[in-house]
């Protein structure tokens, strides 16, 4: 299988396509990072104060996590922010848990934005507007706003480049046969989603790639796409782990919760993969959803149901994590 695939990509045109994919991924990751960092600079102190004041219970923490992640477009950044607040002694572990849960739901906003038809066609216009605000105005807040807009445009431009490259790849028989294996080997899809997301440290990037692959027909079956999405949610926990290294015990426990929450949720959904698939298909047929929107629905269902499932067992999970990571 792999020998045929690597023989296929030796072709010069395929290498050029792959270089385009890598470039598109780089632009996407830079855009999402620029947007998030600029937003944190623009409203960072206010955002931290709001989070500190409003996360007095888990459910409020979930809402804050959804809101913040929906704005900065990165669940990893929101999770890392909550862990940094723990390390600074400004937040307790139970408060952070709500934010982590909400961040998982909030990150699905990006998938829904990608599902809008032809949104990538406006990416260069958005980039141009952002550049004008950066280079032609001296006001710091205007410059930061320009960076946010520029990052937003780069995000969609990078995804458009990746989508174009993937659609060309999908036309090749060898690549299509390789991707078809995900339908019959869900564990391979789970592993692929985990590894890719851990490497790029962006679940939104992996989700966007899955959307493009499913839309182009490279992943011909929804059943082949779902395990990759589930693996995506495992791989994204790497950021929380890295953020907690060298931190206080509470920060390490919050990172452990993120791993426990996402990994156990993925395992449960792998067990109920067929009912999960049937529910997504039902929504697809009910709303006449496009392939990209279908993946966005699947992403939302997993993260919402996973949160609703575990929110009632937070005390028990905290007790277990304290046993695994003892200390004060």
Model-predicted regions and their roles:
Residues 3-58, 149-195, 213:
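Helix-loop-helix hairpins and the membrane-proximal interhelical loops
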Residues 6-19, 112-122, 176-183, 223-226, ...:
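Interfacial loop-to-helix junctions that mark the boundaries of transmembrane helices
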Residues 20-33, 65-69, 127-137, 151-161, ...:
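Hydrophobic core segments of alpha-helical transmembrane domains in multi-pass membrane transport
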Residues 27, 40, 76-80, 107-114, ...:
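Alpha-helical transmembrane segments and their lipid-water interface positions
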Residues 30, 34-42, 46, 50, ...:
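Membrane-spanning helices that line or support transport/gating and their immediate boundary helices
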Residues 45, 49, 53, 57, ...:
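Alpha-helical transmembrane segments of multi-pass membrane proteins, especially transporters
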Residues 71-72, 78-104, 112-122, 132-134, ...:
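Membrane-interfacial helix-loop connectors
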Residues 159, 166-182, 246-328:
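Transmembrane alpha-helical segments and their short flanking loops
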């Amino acid at each position: 299988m792999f020998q045929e695939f690597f023989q296929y990509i030796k072709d010069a045109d395929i290498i050029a396509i792959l270089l385009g994919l890598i470039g598109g991924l780089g632009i996407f990751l830079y855009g999402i990072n620029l947007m998030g960092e600029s937003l944190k600079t623009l409203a960072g102190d206010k955002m931290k104060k709001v989070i500190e004041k409003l996360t007095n219970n888990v459910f409020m923490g979930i809402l804050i996590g959804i809101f913040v992640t929906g704005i900065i477009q990165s669940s990893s950044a929101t999770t890392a922010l909550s862990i940094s607040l723990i390390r600074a002694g400004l937040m307790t572990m139970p408060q952070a848990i709500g934010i982590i849960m909400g961040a998982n739901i909030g990150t699905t906003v990006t998938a829904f934005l990608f599902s809008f038809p032809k949104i990538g066609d406006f990416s260069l216009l958005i980039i141009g507007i952002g550049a004008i605000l950066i280079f032609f105005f001296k006001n710091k807040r205007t410059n930061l706003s320009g960076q946010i807009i520029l990052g937003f445009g780069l995000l969609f431009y990078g995804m458009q480049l990746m989508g174009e490259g993937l659609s060309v790849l999908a036309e090749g028989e060898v690549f299509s046969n390789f991707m078809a294996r995900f339908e019959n080997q869900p564990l391979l899809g789970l592993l692929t989603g985990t590894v890719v997301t851990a490497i790029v440290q962006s679940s939104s990037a992996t989700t966007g790639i899955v959307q493009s692959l499913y839309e182009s027909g490279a992943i011909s079956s929804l059943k082949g796409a779902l395990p990759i999405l589930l693996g995506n949610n495992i791989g994204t926990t790497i950021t929380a782990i890295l953020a907690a290294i060298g931190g206080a015990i509470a920060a390490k426990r919050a990172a452990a919760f993120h791993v426990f929450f996402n990994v156990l949720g993925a395992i449960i959904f792998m067990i109920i993969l067929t009912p999960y698939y049937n529910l997504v298909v039902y929504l697809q047929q009910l709303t006449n959803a496009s392939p990209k929107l279908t993946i966005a629905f699947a992403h939302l269902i997993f993260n919402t149901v996973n949160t609703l499932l575990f929110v009632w067992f937070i005390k028990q999970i905290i007790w277990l994590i304290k046993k695994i990571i003892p200390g004060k």
